[in-house]
Amino acid sequence: MSDTTNEVEETYEVDEQGIAYSSESAPSADAPLRPATIAPANATGRRKEAVARVRLVPGTGEWTVNGRTLDSYFPNKLHQQVVNEPFVTTQLEGRFDVIARIHGGGITGQAGALRLGVARALNAVDVEANRPSLKKAGLLTRDARVIERKKAGLKKARKAPQFSKR
């Protein structure tokens, strides 16, 4: 049996500081703009009382939220659309598997937290390509609106008891 693999030897030269470099030419202009191998990215998103820890792994677009599929965790199509928005904005649908752990808050808050976490993770994957579109769509901004506290002497945060002039 003969081994028919073609091996290409790369030649490296050493400069006066002892740093090795290649004398080969730069990559061609038609090289892909996005990196071929993408490392997994982690990020955290928060919304109201909800916190989502997100991990993006190169894959086929599978979602795992607290050990369940996206459809079973968020049965409402609106929440699914909110969560998927960063992928639609960056045109990367189906390129990453999402593994998320969410706790606290309600369903809408959790969907918002997951959206922010996914957007931050996509930003971490490729800042130059993804950040402008995510920033323009407002997906990298934390929504700071939270429940206003109840004040003493009032029925709710702002609702006062009925006032009688006489």
Swiss-Prot record:
Keyword Glycoprotein annotated: no
PROSITE patterns linked to this entry: RIBOSOMAL_S9 (PS00360)
UniProt signal peptide: none
Keywords on record: Ribonucleoprotein, Ribosomal protein
An example Gene Ontology CC term for this record: small ribosomal subunit
Gene Ontology BP annotations: translation
Start-end of Acidic residues biased regions: 1-16
Entry's Gene Ontology molecular function annotations: RNA binding; structural constituent of ribosome
Keyword Ribonucleoprotein: yes
Cited Pfam families: Ribosomal_S9
Annotated spans, Disordered: 1-45
Top-level taxon of origin: Bacteria
Family to which this protein belongs: Belongs to the universal ribosomal protein uS9 family.
Name used for this protein in its record: Small ribosomal subunit protein uS9
Organism: Nocardioides sp. (strain ATCC BAA-499 / JS614)
Organismal lineage: Bacteria, Bacillati, Actinomycetota, Actinomycetes, Propionibacteriales
